[in-house]
């Protein structure tokens, strides 16, 4: 399925590092970045953050895209954030704008919620003064508008990006990421919980040192009470990391990758006892280590992993399944070998399909003795493609067969009940669009 079905909007849909979720078989997409189209920036392959005042919806039955505008008090540019959907509400926390990293949360919600307070009493000195508000917009309404929100209790996590989130019992459970702490915060943090990568300093009155690095912290935001908390975890925690992938199965949060390991590691956090478990696997049976990939739950015991940036510096196109009961990886054959992806999204759709959207197809990073070499221009994608993870029902097979062979049934379609006819015609639109793409 190609995003070009949105009339004249194809290039505007190209993006990476966005957030996405599926509601009523409609894919919602917000944020991310793409290659700048300004003449002076095109040659250098400079990326720009996409508009924050719009959200895109794709009807997965017909393949048709629709843009909704979110007006009001629009947030500033934001990348590297973490988005999550709770009861049809999109929450966005952290990330980085043109000024630096953020520890402010933004939510899309219809009710007024409060502004998050930071744990640092001198935040204007510690971190650049940006993204200090929370915002809300009810995306289920025909007209959406950003609204500033106020007052949350508890201690807000330090600024970060490239973190992950599990949604469990209307709570947002964040893990890891890359960000900034004051030297005082670092002194009060276990050395195994924050790895300092570099330091900088600012002088406003007194000299203040800031430490930049990776963490393995767990922070919880309760959406019902608007309260932050930091549970004490037990067991062997993952090493500090970012750009990893997370997924939820029952009461357990799983994460993989994001660390510089030759094989893809996988951990589990029990969200009731807050106990970590690491899966010890034979290296010969595990996928290549990677980051910026996706991990999607497809059953009560299976996790589907796709793509990412390999430890070898190349964008990957492989698909794997991890069975949490047997504790084993299985490499999957699939029809999308021509679609390597990094910084994409992968959502669970109807019939346990994995719906992949966007991302970059050619990110390549290699290190030599002097510098880091990066692919000059990224190819940000706009297509939606689907992985089938189980046999379809007879109804789904018939629906798709009629949609893909509409000429055979052209005279009979009007005989169907109106609701069924409407659904079949959406499938006709979908397969007609596919034929146009294949013959273009």
Residue ranges and their predicted role:
Residues 1, 34, 349-440:
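Cullin-RING E3 adaptor/co-adaptor recruitment helices
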Residues 1-12, 63-69, 148-150:
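A short helix->beta-strand "capping" segment at the edge of beta-propeller domains
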Residues 9, 23-48, 70, 86-105, ...:
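Glycine-centered tight turns/hairpins at beta-strand boundaries that repeat
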Residues 13, 48, 76-77, 127, ...:
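Conserved loop/turn at the beginning of each blade in beta-propeller domains
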Residues 16-20, 77-83, 159-165, 217, ...:
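Beta-propeller and closely related beta-sheet repeat lectin domains
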Residues 43-63, 102-120, 124-144, 187-226, ...:
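Beta-propeller blade signature
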Residues 239, 278-292, 325-351:
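Conserved blade-ending motifs and adjacent loop-strand segments that build the rim/top face
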Residues 286-324, 345, 362-363:
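Loop/turn-rich, solvent-exposed surfaces of beta-rich toroidal or solenoidal domains
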């Amino acid at each position: 399925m190609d995003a070009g079905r949105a009339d004249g909007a194809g290039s505007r849909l190209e993006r990476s590092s966005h957030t996405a979720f599926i509601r009523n078989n409609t894919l919602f997409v917000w944020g991310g970045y793409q290659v700048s189209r300004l003449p002076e920036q095109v040659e250098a392959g400079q990326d720009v953050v996409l508009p924050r005042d719009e959200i895109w919806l794709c009807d997965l039955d017909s393949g048709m895209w629709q843009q909704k505008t979110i007006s009001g008090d629009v947030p500033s540019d934001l990348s590297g954030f973490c988005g999550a959907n709770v009861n049809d509400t999109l929450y966005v926390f952290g990330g980085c704008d043109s000024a630096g990293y953020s520890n402010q949360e933004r939510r899309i919600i219809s009710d007024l919620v409060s502004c998050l307070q930071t744990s640092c009493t001198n935040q204007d000195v510690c971190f650049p003064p940006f993204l200090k508000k929370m915002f809300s917009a009810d995306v289920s309404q025909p007209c959406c508008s950003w609204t500033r929100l106020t007052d949350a209790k508890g201690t807000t996590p330090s600024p970060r990006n490239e973190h992950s989130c599990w949604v469990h019992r209307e709570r947002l459970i964040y893990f890891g990421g890359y960000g900034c702490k004051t030297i005082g915060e670092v002194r009060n943090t276990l050395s195994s919980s924050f790895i300092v990568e570099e330091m900088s300093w600012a002088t406003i009155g007194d000299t203040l040192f800031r430490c930049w690095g990776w963490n393995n912290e767990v922070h919880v935001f309760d959406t019902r009470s608007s309260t932050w908390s930091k549970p004490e975890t037990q067991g062997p925690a993952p090493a500090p990391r970012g750009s990893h992938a997370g997924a939820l199965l029952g009461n357990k949060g799983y994460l993989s990758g994001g660390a510089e390991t030759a094989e893809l590691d996988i951990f589990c956090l029990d969200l009731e006892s807050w106990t970590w478990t690491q899966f010890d696997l034979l290296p010969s049976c595990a996928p290549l280590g990677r980051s910026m990939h996706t991990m999607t739950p497809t059953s009560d015991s299976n996790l589907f992993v796709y793509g990412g940036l390999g430890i070898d510096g190349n964008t990957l196109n492989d698909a794997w399944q991890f069975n949490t009961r047997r504790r084993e990886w299985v490499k999957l054959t699939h029809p999308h070998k021509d679609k390597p992806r990094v910084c994409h999204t992968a959502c669970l759709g109807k019939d346990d399909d994995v719906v992949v959207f966007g991302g970059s197809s050619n990110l390549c990073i290699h290190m030599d003795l002097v510098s880091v070499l990066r692919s000059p221009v990224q190819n940000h994608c706009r297509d939606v493609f689907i992985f089938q993870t189980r046999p379809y029902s007879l109804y789904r097979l018939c629906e798709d067969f009629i949609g893909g062979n509409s000429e055979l049934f052209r005279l009979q379609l009007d005989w169907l009940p109106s609701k069924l006819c409407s659904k079949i015609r959406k499938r006709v639109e979908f397969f007609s669009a596919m034929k146009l793409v294949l013959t273009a």
